[in-house]
Amino acid sequence: MALYAIGDLHLSLGTDKPMDIFGGAWLGYMDKLRKGLSSITSEDTTILLGDLTWSLDLDGAEADFAFLNAIPGRKIILKGNHDYWWTTATKFYKFCELKGFTDMFILNNNAYEYEDYAICGTRGWFFEEDAAEGSHNDKIFKRELIRLETSLQQAGDKPKLCFLHYPPRYRGYECPEINQSFFFIKIQN
């Protein structure tokens, strides 16, 4: 049972916004994705770290979720900052049931088991040091901290594997508020 994580897929199978237009490493990215995802088995778990589709709603994202549904095994989904399709977990699960999509689960204020570990996480938010108290970004950031703490609490005493869309450490910057909420552990095979 392997554990995989991938984010920022920005699928556009149902919209006209392919990432190939950015050139470079993005050229042929769907073929690269298919090749990379082909090693996943039905026994594995894949964490989808947000920004899954460019679609603005679930119906428009049907082709993208069909692609994700075809990935074998369990898929655990976090929200990204470009996941405009995201409404509620209830609506997502109804959509999946209607379309026959299986083994896709939302990680939001909850936790999932993976072997002897608990999978926790949330979108997070990029912390801006110069954001004014009470600003839009400040409110989102504080809400994401609450979601992260809720997810960690839902895990109980199990060792935690924590995933975020926004990294708490990035190019020399560390987000102390998020780093205080959890600890990093190293998994050795």
Whereabouts are the PLM-identified features?
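Short, conserved loop/helix-junction motifs that constitute active-site signature segments
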Residues: 66-72, 155, 179-187
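Conserved catalytic scaffold of divalent metal-dependent phosphoesterases
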Residues: 9-16, 87-177
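Active-site glycine-centered loops adjacent to acidic/histidine catalytic or metal-binding residues
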Residues: 8, 50-51, 80-81, 165, ...
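Short internal beta-strands
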Residues: 74-82
